From Swiss-Prot:
Modified residues (Phosphoserine): 94, 99, 104, 107, 112
The protein's name: Mitochondrial import receptor subunit TOM70
TPR repeats, residue ranges: 116-149, 155-188, 296-329, 331-364, 369-402, 403-436, 444-477, 478-511, 513-546, 547-580
Record organism: Rattus norvegicus (Rat)
Region of interest (Disordered), residue spans: 69-109
Keywords for this protein: Acetylation, Isopeptide bond, Membrane, Methylation, Mitochondrion, Mitochondrion outer membrane, Phosphoprotein, Repeat, TPR repeat, Transmembrane, Transmembrane helix, Ubl conjugation
Entry keyword annotation includes Magnesium: no
Gene this protein is translated from: Tomm70
GO CC, alphabetical: mitochondrial membrane; mitochondrial outer membrane; mitochondrion
PROSITE patterns associated with the record: TPR (PS50005), TPR_REGION (PS50293)
Family, per entry: Belongs to the Tom70 family.
Topological domain spans for side Mitochondrial intermembrane: 2-41
Biased composition (Low complexity): 93-108
Chain positions with N-acetylalanine modification: 2
């Protein structure tokens, strides 16, 4: 399957960071056949029946049944409030000193609790008047007067004092008082949320995450403020963890299927073309099966030979020999080495090689254009769309007849939500390469998503008809079937979508992502968890480097309540991530699962099962 991921990334971008593998395949975020393939993450969530909250891939997965149970039947003592956060302190007014309970004015000796309530009421008046220091004094008096067995009242006094400290931006005191309140009333949502905000200000991200996770669950995921804070801290934690991990990661060569799919998205790429006659000798392989000798002592030609034999681990070293010797094929070797640096997720190593190829005015223009495409894609992965656009435009300027420029720029335009411009680029690619099935399939998908988003039924039907024409004209294009399957799934035509995925598997039996998509379809279509997991497990069996399979398996295990297994799956995906951005997203999933595990233990919340 060639390049489904970049097409869907535009639609998924609003829901989650792209699941890219850091390789500039046919566009914006990942190599084809990698990452999340054609299915946006909100589709993954729908397929497994899980709420996908917020926009950064920070998934809190909790069953709807559990949410309803948690939201209902809980008394005021829990502190649960469905509305947005109150800005005023809590507590009803107590009888004033010298007033009897019947309002007669009879002077009665007040109990300790009554005096504490009176002090709190006075503090509330100071709070509303913006006199926070005086309010704190009153709340402190209330705490000292309140009987120690009155947990609910004491927790309110501590929470109110924390609110006053919050107005003074005394975050340490806020956290301390909220902790006291929560110790007295463990499910006190207001105190938990206020402490979460204090932890955020104190840069205690993990503590903030745990508190806000508890709030989200206890509120039944109904309060936007708490969900936004959860999303924010998960993003920060994910980026922080990924930055450290990515620096020290071991480069990892993707599967042969991944690499073949990647190169299949290029048609004007000199370095991926078969070796020409005369570039290698006519000698047979020796009895030990060693590579054929090349006529010239060229590291680049040896690298090309290894590439044809799928002996990918030796390519970078052979290219380096050509470059060090300043050989005849130095420009080609630089580009091939850069490409494999990208494939193993070493963008920092790739960039100098790409820069040098681009600057070689005497080099073949197609080499320079290809380097610009790959550097432009890399910039997009690094969230630098202006630099990316500049590189693609320069590529079009120096090599206007290069179909790859328009194909890959079309992917960029989709990521930038410029669908009409994307379609124009796909059309330009098709004019130059009428038999390039991938561009035709992706054009159909872009038109379909545009019509689907606009709820234009006639254009949706036209796009669906376009898919039929593409698969009829190009029956060997697995990507056509895969993209059509996603459109069919959107249209609730699950049976036909399943047939399309079967076609993909027939054409590319080693493409693990297709099995993941088919597995997700079983969940969405038939709620057949066993079949879905069987297919995703098959994907891992086929390609144990398929990060998308591990990520999806982890997501499902969270929904099943198997947090330990989910965390294990997310960690495996993290180790396979080929971009820092993708790794950050995966860390956010893993951190969310960790937080839910801790909250479930602390508050006695049993993880749900599907």
């Amino acid at each position: 399957m060639a390049a489904s991921k970049p097409v869907e990334a535009a639609m998924a971008a609003a829901a989650a960071p792209a699941s890219g593998n850091g390789v500039g395949s046919s566009g914006g975020t990942a190599a084809p056949g990698s990452g999340a393939g054609t299915l946006p993450r909100w589709h993954v969530a729908l397929a497994i029946g899980a709420p996908l909250l917020l926009g950064a891939g920070a998934m809190y997965l909790w069953s709807r049944r559990r949410r309803r149970r948690e939201a209902g039947g809980r008394g005021d003592a829990s502190g649960l409030k469905r509305n947005s956060e109150r800005k005023t302190p809590e507590g009803r007014a107590s009888p004033a000193l010298g007033s009897g309970p019947d309002g007669s004015g009879d002077s009665l000796e007040m109990s300790s609790l009554d005096r504490a309530q009176a002090a709190k009421n006075k503090g509330n008046k100071y709070f509303k008047a913006g006199k926070y220091e005086q309010a704190i004094q009153c709340y402190t008096e209330a705490i000292s007067l309140c009987p120690t067995e009155k947990n609910a009242d004491l927790s309110t006094f501590y929470q109110n004092r924390a609110a006053a400290f919050e107005q003074l931006q005394k975050w340490k005191e806020v956290a301390q008082d909220c902790t006291k309140a929560v110790e007295l009333n463990p499910k006190y949502v207001k105190a938990l949320f206020r402490r979460a905000k204090a932890h955020e200000k104190l840069d205690n991200k993990k503590e903030c995450l745990e508190d806000v996770t508890a709030v989200c669950i206890l509120e039944g995921f109904q309060n936007e403020q708490s969900m936004l804070l959860a999303d924010k801290v998960l993003k920060l934690l994910g980026k922080e963890n990924a930055k450290e991990k990515y620096k020290n990661r071991e480069p990892l060569m993707p599967s042969p299927q991944f690499i073949k799919s990647y190169f299949s998205s290029f048609t004007d790429d000199i370095i991926s073309q078969p070796m020409l006659k005369g570039e290698k000798s006519d000698e047979d392989k020796d009895k030990e099966g060693e590579a054929l000798e090349v006529k010239e002592n060229s590291g680049y030609l040896k690298a090309k030979q290894y590439m044809e034999e799928e002996n990918y681990d030796k390519i970078i070293s052979e290219c380096s020999k050509e470059i060090d010797a300043q050989g005849k094929y130095m420009a080609e070797a630089l580009l091939l080495r850069a490409t494999f640096y990208l494939l193993i997720g070493s963008a920092n190593a790739a960039k100098p090689d790409l820069d040098k190829v681009i600057s070689l005015k005497e080099a073949n223009v197609k080499l320079r254009a290809n380097a610009l495409i790959k550097r432009g894609t890399m910039c997009m992965q690094q969230q630098q769309p202006m630099l990316s656009t500049q590189d693609f435009n320069m590529a079009a300027e120096i090599d206007p007849m290069n179909s790859d420029v328009y194909h890959h720029r079309g992917q960029l335009k989709i990521l930038l939500d410029l669908v009409e411009e994307a379609v124009a680029d796909f059309d330009a690619c098709i004019r130059l390469r009428p038999k390039f099935a991938l561009a035709q399939a992706q054009k159909c998908f872009a038109l379909y998503r545009q019509a689907y988003t606009a709820n234009n039924s006639s254009q949706v039907q036209a796009a669906m008809k376009g898919f039929e024409e593409v698969i009829k004209k190009f029956p060997r294009c697995a990507e056509g079937y895969a993209l059509y399957a996603q459109a069919l799934t959107d249209q609730q035509q699950f049976g036909k979508a399943d047939e399309m995925y079967d076609k993909c598997i027939d054409l590319e039996p080693d493409n693990a992502t297709t099995y993941v998509h088919k597995g997700l379809l079983q969940l969405q279509w038939k709620q057949d968890l066993d079949k879905g997991l069987e297919l995703i497990s098959k994907a891992i069996e086929i390609d144990n480097k398929c990060d998308f399979a591990y990520e999806t398996m982890g997501t499902i295990e969270v929904q099943r309540g198997n947090m330990e297994k989910a965390i294990d799956m997310f960690n495996k995906a993290i180790n396979l991530a080929k971009s820092e951005m993708e790794m950050a997203h995966l860390y956010s999933l893993c951190d969310a699962a960790h937080a839910q595990t801790e909250v479930a233990k602390k508050y006695g919340l049993k993880p749900p099962t599907l």
